[in-house]
């Protein structure tokens, strides 16, 4: 029990956590676990009913694309979604449920998950809370946050996560990701589009490291 939240104890939840633990560094594993608990805290704060198992599996497997389990030529969130779906199907999870997890993971980079159903939105907010500054109305109880950090410390996450991204970019040249067409047009048309430095994006998170 962490901050009044108990992670699901189903067979597939335990298997997913073990799989993420096996392939992830300490920095990455602690990140995905924090994301789950932060998402649950947002769900509790907003009174949103969630499928706890689906949210847990989606959260703990969402960065497999940075690991050996999700190696491949495509960008990391797509490779991670493929790896998670294959893992779930291999464990006997139903096809439609495995696809739900695929969508949650493949769309977690950017803002698309924030426009989906409420359970997906709070899961995405949990991920974003660990990464960057969020509006004041999305603040969480500091005592609950501290309890999550006690169990899953950040271990220099801001620097460590940037290094993980750098290694991902170095492994795939040219990187297989395209800017949104509207972003490209606005950048070349007005040169006013703000593209933040990664150090500023990650550095804005409300944590020391």
Model feature map: region roles:
Residues 1-17:
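Short alpha-helical hairpin
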Residues 2-3, 23-48, 93, 110-209:
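Divalent metal-dependent phosphate-bond-processing catalytic cores, especially two-metal-ion Mg2+/Mn2+ enzymes
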Residues 13-31, 63-67:
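Active-site flanking loop/helix segments enriched in acidic
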Residues 30, 50-54, 75, 79, ...:
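Alpha-helix N-cap and coil->helix boundary residues
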Residues 35-37, 75-90:
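An active-site-proximal "capping" alpha-helix that borders the catalytic cofactor pocket
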Residues 53-70, 80, 101-111:
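His-Asp-centered metal-binding catalytic motifs of divalent-metal-dependent phosphohydrolases/nucleases
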Residues 67-75, 92-93:
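Short coil/turn segments at secondary-structure boundaries
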Residues 84, 88-97, 136-137:
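Inter-helical turn/loop segments and adjacent helix faces that build the functional surface
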């Amino acid at each position: 029990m962490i901050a009044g939240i108990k992670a699901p104890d189903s067979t597939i939840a335990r298997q997913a956590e073990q799989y993420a633990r096996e392939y992830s560094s300490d920095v990455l594993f602690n990140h995905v676990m924090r994301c789950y608990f932060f998402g649950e805290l947002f769900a509790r704060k907003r009174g949103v009913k969630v499928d706890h198992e689906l949210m847990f599996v989606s959260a703990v497997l969402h960065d497999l694309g940075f690991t050996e389990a999700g190696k491949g030529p495509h960008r990391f969130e797509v490779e991670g979604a493929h790896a998670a779906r294959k893992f779930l199907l291999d464990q006997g999870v139903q096809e439609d449920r495995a696809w739900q997890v695929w969508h949650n993971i493949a769309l977690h980079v950017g803002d698309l998950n924030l426009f989906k159903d409420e359970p997906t939105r709070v899961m995405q907010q949990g991920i974003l809370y660990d990464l960057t500054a969020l509006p004041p109305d999305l603040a969480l109880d500091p005592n609950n946050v501290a309890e999550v950090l006690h169990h899953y410390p950040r271990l220099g996450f801001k620097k460590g996560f940037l290094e993980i991204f750098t290694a991902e970019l170095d492994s795939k040249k040219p990187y297989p990701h395209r800017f949104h067409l509207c972003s490209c047009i606005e950048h070349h048309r007005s040169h006013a589009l703000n593209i933040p430095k990664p150090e500023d994006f990650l550095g804005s998170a409300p944590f020391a490291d």
